[in-house]
Amino acid sequence: MNLLITGGMGHIGSKLINKLSSLDKIKKIIIIDNFSSERYISFINLKNRKKIIFFDEDLVHFNLNKIKNKIDCIIHLASTTNAEKSFSNKERVLDNNVECTNKILALGNKNTKIIFAS
């Protein structure tokens, strides 16, 4: 199974990736993260790197055609999480939390499993 994990370098994503990468049935994990959380240590601590493809990009601008048809399951964790700061940057929050979710939903086909953490 090939996974796409957006926001994979956040707290939940990094823990999840290390658990999933140890499973035999997981062949590849594609991660898209822009390091907005500045959790660089999460990247350094990744295990089973041979299964991981990492894109250090903002999902807003990422061309999902690069990975289309290579994904069996999407775990969508990317979002703007600082509620206090979100009021002063509504357009960015709309892009991150709504438009990116729409992009992810459009990427999947009828057989793609999508897990969305909100």
Regions found by a protein language model. Give the residues of each.
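N-terminal Rossmann/SDR dinucleotide-binding element
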Residues: 1-73
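Ser/Thr-centric signal marking residues that sit
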Residues: 6, 81, 101, 112
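Conserved active-site helix of classical SDR/Rossmann-fold NAD(P)-dependent CH-OH oxidoreductases
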Residues: 18, 101-102
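NAD(P)H-binding glycine-rich loop region in Rossmannoid oxidoreductase-like domains
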Residues: 59-95
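Conserved Rossmann-fold NAD(P)-dependent oxidoreductase catalytic core, especially the SDR/UDP-sugar
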Residues: 76, 102-118
